[in-house]
């Protein structure tokens, strides 16, 4: 079992890249479902994209030591990875894919060391990222401004990752990342 960690600013296309990679059966990937205290967006379902819990329940699980990593990503919105989720996917003999915020990604890379490939997906520019976030129509202008400010900071952290890939074109990005993963899995 190997670990592939993806981190990126919100709106970079991380979920789309991961969705395409999971279709490539030769990579033997399984998606680690994170737990969050935020409300579901759009068509998100509990146990598919995330495990949705209250902030109180999340804090209870933190105190119980249930998470291998966790962060308060936005005020009052917690994200984390249950240790039991890694055990579940490991038992299936899969390579595990994580979709984490920047600090969660850095922490997981430190935890797993050479067993993990940490990939930072970067938008072509902050202007393009703003357009993508506006097109998504899930956030207020204030929330988009907050996400752009956070993205600038996250991009500064990219050097902590093994590889940085710019997502300017989904198919090109997916192929580039698939090659990185194949190379990692074969070593």
PLM features: residue spans?
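Post-Walker A helix-loop "phosphate-sensing" segment adjacent to the P-loop in P-loop NTPases
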Residues: 23-31
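ATP-dependent small-molecule kinase phosphotransfer cores
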Residues: 36-96, 102-106
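Walker A/P-loop
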Residues: 15
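ATP-binding Walker
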Residues: 12
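NTP-dependent small-molecule kinase module
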Residues: 131, 135-139, 153-187
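Conserved phosphate-donor/acceptor-positioning beta-strand/loop module used by diverse small-molecule
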Residues: 97-101, 111-135
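P-loop (Walker A) phosphate-binding loop of NTP-binding proteins
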Residues: 7-9
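Post-Walker A alpha-helix
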Residues: 18-19
